[in-house]
Curated annotation (Swiss-Prot):
Residues 33-44 have a biased composition (Low complexity). It comes from Bordetella pertussis (strain Tohama I / ATCC BAA-589 / NCTC 13251). Keywords: Disulfide bond, Periplasm, Redox-active center, Signal. Pfam families: DsbC_N, Thioredoxin_2. This is Probable thiol:disulfide interchange protein DsbC. The lineage of its organism: Bacteria, Pseudomonadati, Pseudomonadota, Betaproteobacteria, Burkholderiales. SUPFAM superfamilies: Thioredoxin-like (SSF52833). Belongs to the thioredoxin family. DsbC subfamily.
């Protein structure tokens, strides 16, 4: 029997459906019969936007979980899943209306049966409406009220009347981020808030500090991302820890990560027509 293959915190099952044999793993306690409610989430893991330490009273924080009513059967599924796949932080397990349990790990969604004998990864399609239920759920779970983003920590760029608004997490060494900037060059009437997110290479932190501490961060940022002009050295107390903490809270694993005023988000650079449609 082939087993699963994982890659980092963002787990990647290479096999869509596989069997976890009961002879190999012992099952957990039998679950009580629930009434179809969603499972409870464990306490939120939150970080302050004013530092890299756990949040203190009064700090702005973002939840990575939604409030859920108790469901003992889903709790039992979560316990069994944790026993069989040690080392993975299961965000929540929820009962679905189609006879499976939804297992959330960060922004990833998997599906399993009550005994965690089978695990499925991939899009779940509503056969009647042809809707991608998995994608809809991921978008809902990862949505963030735009007005709650700490935009004072972002580099602000305005074109035209600035009426269309989006926020982006970007690393200065991100090729796809530079591709996004080339797309934005052809667009008008837009405001872009950039959260500098140095995660890709050792000198990313140096570059974001030089950009943030410049006399005109928006110009220096554009000169680097569009024209390849390296930022001049600058010194100040750049909020690097706050950027990284915010990204962790919002489960940003790569760049660019685009947040729209509607509350939706997209990972990756979009072609112009798709970007226009979302703004």
């Amino acid at each position: 029997m082939s087993g699963p293959s994982f890659s980092g915190a963002g787990m990647n099952f290479r096999i869509t459906v596989w069997c976890a044999a009961a002879a190999v793993w012992s099952s957990g306690a039998l679950a009580q019969d629930g009434a179809g409610q969603a499972a409870p989430g464990t306490p939120d893991k939150v970080y302050s936007t004013t530092g890299s330490a756990p949040a203190k009273p009064g700090d702005k924080v973002y939840s990575t979980r939604s409030a859920q009513a108790p469901d003992p059967q889903a709790d039992a599924v979560k316990e069994r899943f944790a026993q069989r796949f040690e080392g993975f932080d299961v965000t929540a397990v929820r009962r679905t209306p189609y006879g499976l349990f939804e297992v959330q790990i960060g922004t990833d969604l998997l599906y399993t049966d009550e005994k965690v004998t089978w695990v499925m990864e991939g899009p779940l399609i509503d056969a009647l409406t042809r809707r991608d239920v998995t994608r809809e759920r991921q978008e809902k779970l990862s949505s963030v009220p735009f007005e709650e983003l700490p935009l004072d920590l972002a580099v602000k760029q305005v074109k035209g009347d600035g009426s269309r608004v989006m926020a982006v997490f970007e690393d200065p060494n991100c090729g796809y981020c530079k591709q996004l900037h080339r797309t934005l060059e052809d667009m008008d009437n837009i405001t872009v808030y950039t959260f500098l997110y140095p995660i890709l290479s050792p000198d990313s932190t140096t570059k974001v500090r030089d950009i943030w501490c410049a006399s005109d961060p928006a110009k220096v940022w554009k000169d680097w991302m569009v024209r390849g002009q390296r930022p001049p050295t600058a010194e100040c107390d750049a909020p690097v820890d706050q950027w990284l903490a915010l990204g962790r809270q919002l489960m940003v694993r790569g760049t660019p990560a685009i947040f729209f005023k509607s509350g939706g988000r997209v990972s990756g650079a979009l072609p112009r027509d798709e970007l226009e449609a979302r703004l």
